[in-house]
């Protein structure tokens, strides 16, 4: 749910990525252009209810991992998705990102954060344009919550 636009909801499940603009009465499928329609982590841009971020995962029988060994965050636009990969590992990055392991903060530009089951936290302080490892060698990250402390 977008904090400033409670009518706008996003949903990702085992059969697609969806958006509702009427508090969940109707849903539109918005995963066209993603490499997979399966994945868990998703967060909404703090100021633009039309933009969300997700990390599609390649479904395997017993695990879910970043696609093709590359870690890619996708940012939605009006009718398309854009890859955001600068600073993310692009080779041998067979990482899993769990359902609640992605969030955004309220800064401008927005900070976007996600954690992996391998114990890494990735952070972007520019709406997802560039990424860095904010923490590594942690236990599995099951949930990420961003907070701004002033």
Residue ranges and their predicted role:
Residues 1-150:
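Extracellular glycan-interacting surfaces
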């Amino acid at each position: 749910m977008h904090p400033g636009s409670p009518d706008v909801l996003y949903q990702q499940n085992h059969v697609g990525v969806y958006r509702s603009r009427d508090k969940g009465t109707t849903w539109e499928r918005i995963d066209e252009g993603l490499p997979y329609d399966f994945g868990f982590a998703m967060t909404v841009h703090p100021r633009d209810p039309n933009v969300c971020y997700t990390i599609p995962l390649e479904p395997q029988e017993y695990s879910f991992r970043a696609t093709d060994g590359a870690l890619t965050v996708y940012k939605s636009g009006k009718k398309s998705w854009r890859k955001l990969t600068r600073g993310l590992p692009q080779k041998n990055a067979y990482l899993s990102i769990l359902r609640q392991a992605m969030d955004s903060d309220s800064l401008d530009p927005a900070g976007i954060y996600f954690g992996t089951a391998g114990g890494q936290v990735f952070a972007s302080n520019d709406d997802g344009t560039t990424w860095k490892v904010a923490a590594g060698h942690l236990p599995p990250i099951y949930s990420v919550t961003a907070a701004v402390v002033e």
